[in-house]
Amino acid sequence: MAEKTYPMTLEEKEKLEKELEELKLVRRPEIVERIKIARSYGDLSENSEYEAAKDEQAFVEGQISTIETKIRYAEIVNSDAVAADEVAIGKTVTVQEVGETEEEVYHIVGAAGADVFANKISNESPIGHALIGKKTGDVATIETPAGSYDVKILKVEKTK
């Protein structure tokens, strides 16, 4: 069975590599040291410092594993390979909900680069999924748990 690929820009992959390095070279050794210190307190059955450090260790190891998988199966997307006015990972899209006047600007990224506070939406999100492959002037239907709505694509450009 083929592994799932993770579409992302080169910048997103580099960001993941830096995060992985931070986890392996900084966080992991810090946690190991905390576990060592907590063990020195004696009885582990009622040692909250030890339990907290072990929980954090499990969390960090899970993050490391997830990031390693995403990097291993990264599919680097070149937004230059699609038409200039076509929505793809690495593009910035300006849309307007049909019947409304306010415009929204989204940066389409792979799941690893999503950041709603910076308007970076994943290609796997309801909005990203509906917009991928559409072109300037197209209308896309966004399906969300709260219902659906239509947006018109006003502008597509390469993310700077």
Swiss-Prot record:
Keywords, alphabetical: Coiled coil, DNA-binding, Transcription, Transcription regulation
Coiled-coil segments: 1-31
Annotated S-S bridges: none
Any one GO MF annotation of this record: DNA binding
Entries under PROSITE patterns matching the protein: GREAB_1 (PS00829), GREAB_2 (PS00830)
GO biological process, one term: DNA-templated transcription elongation
HAMAP family: GreA_GreB
Family membership noted in the UniProt record: Belongs to the GreA/GreB family.
Function: Necessary for efficient RNA polymerase transcription elongation past template-encoded arresting sites. The arresting sites in DNA have the property of trapping a certain fraction of elongating RNA polymerases that pass through, resulting in locked ternary complexes. Cleavage of the nascent transcript by cleavage factors such as GreA or GreB allows the resumption of elongation from the new 3'terminus. GreA releases sequences of 2 to 3 nucleotides.
Name of the molecule in the record: Transcription elongation factor GreA
Organism encoding this protein: Streptococcus suis (strain 05ZYH33)
